Amino acid sequence: MGTLRAILKNPDDLYPLIKLKLAARHAEKQIPPEPHWGFCYLMLQKVSRSFALVIQQLPVELRDAVCIFYLVLRALDTVEDDTSIPTDVKVPILISFHQHVYDREWHFACGTKEYKVLMDQFHHVSTAFLELGKLYQQAIEDITMRMGAGMAKFICKEVETTDDYDEYCHYVAGLVGLGLSKLFHASGKEDLASDSLSNSMGLFLQKTNIIRDYLEDINEVPKCRMFWPREIWSKYVNKLEDLKYEENSVKAVQCLNDMVTNALSHVEDCLTYMFNLHDPAIFRFCAIPQVMAIGTLAMCYDNIEVFRGVVKMRRGLTAKVIDRTKTMADVYGAFFDFSCMLKSKVNNNDPNATKTLKRLDAILKTCRDSGTLNKRKSYIIRNEPNYSPVLIVVIFIILAIILAQLFGSRS
């Protein structure tokens, strides 16, 4: 019902939503027949439906490499995230994880739900990994080794300073950016991007996730996960978990805005990285998550709901981003729109307002200087839908018929 209400409020979401639904069903039918590859692509859909859709942009050989890269790192992340594993057991596994990808027999019981299945049947991932080209294997092994070592370091170390924060995000996400750049280069479709730009691509996504997932991480049992740097949150509260309490709402929002401002420092590097891409499929694969990230930050900024539940873009807006992010002009336009949205929420009384506005103005200037803003229509933000009630009813009926056909064909 929530989706239907959102469509009635935003009728122009309908077409992108239908396209997204059809694309998802198409992706489900593209599962390879080989058992190990079938497992990998099915598992990809279970652990990240959005990534499973975005990866379809890539040619088959590169798609396979990126799929395995993602699952290997997701498995590594599952070990790191499982707070029930004793430190003396977890650290050696993280450090040696890169060796296990060559072992068809290795598995490790941890995680929950689909992540437990991934870990229990990791031999399928190893089997698929061993069928990749050597350059792909070397890139995946190298990044997995470096990431595992970095994760192990922060198992025993808190994120105290913003430098620690950048270092942690480098290990768990910046290295993903470096690895993807290596895979793109190994495919022969892209020049090798600089480490600094690749790192920023990962940091921007990771910091967005850390901001959005505050409540989930702080409520993790048996032990909470704390990724917000003490250097930032200690300016507002005595303990990180204090941010979720209603009596600290004003300070919590100020701290949140500080975190968002920190994340915005990576945007210009991300725009440069995407501008330098040549292959249209790789471009879409990289650009869609970045647009989703700036959109998510715009939703989270100055929003107390981050400390009450999950804040994310509505499904129709997500569908628009996936459908309409095709060129660099689209990216500049989306970043411009979401930055304007974010800027409109900045309160001059916020302690970081000046810094936030400075970073947003720099992003807006980069988008304007591209000279492309007048060449595309803004699909991302619409103030009020200009539709008559009759048209809305007609759209609702059409949607009901289409959804009935889509779901009816399954039975």
UniProtKB/Swiss-Prot annotation:
It comes from Solanum lycopersicum (Tomato). This is Squalene synthase. GO terms for biological process: farnesyl diphosphate metabolic process; sterol biosynthetic process. Keywords: Magnesium, Membrane, Metal-binding, NAD, NADP, Transferase, Transmembrane, Transmembrane helix. One of its GO terms (cellular component) is endoplasmic reticulum membrane. Its main location: membrane. Converts farnesyl diphosphate (FPP) into squalene, a precursor for sterol biosynthesis in eukaryotes. The gene is SS. Belongs to the phytoene/squalene synthase family. Its EC number is 2.5.1.21. Mg(2+) binds at D77, E80, D81. The keyword Cell wall biogenesis/degradation does not apply. Its cofactor is Mg(2+). The keyword Translocase does not apply. GO terms for molecular function: metal ion binding; squalene synthase [NAD(P)H] activity. It is a single-pass membrane protein. It is an enzyme of class 2 (transferase). Coiled coil: none annotated. It catalyses: 2 (2E,6E)-farnesyl diphosphate + NADH + H(+) = squalene + 2 diphosphate + NAD(+); 2 (2E,6E)-farnesyl diphosphate + NADPH + H(+) = squalene + 2 diphosphate + NADP(+). The chain crosses the membrane at residues 388-408. Signal peptide: none annotated. PROSITE patterns: SQUALEN_PHYTOEN_SYN_1, SQUALEN_PHYTOEN_SYN_2.
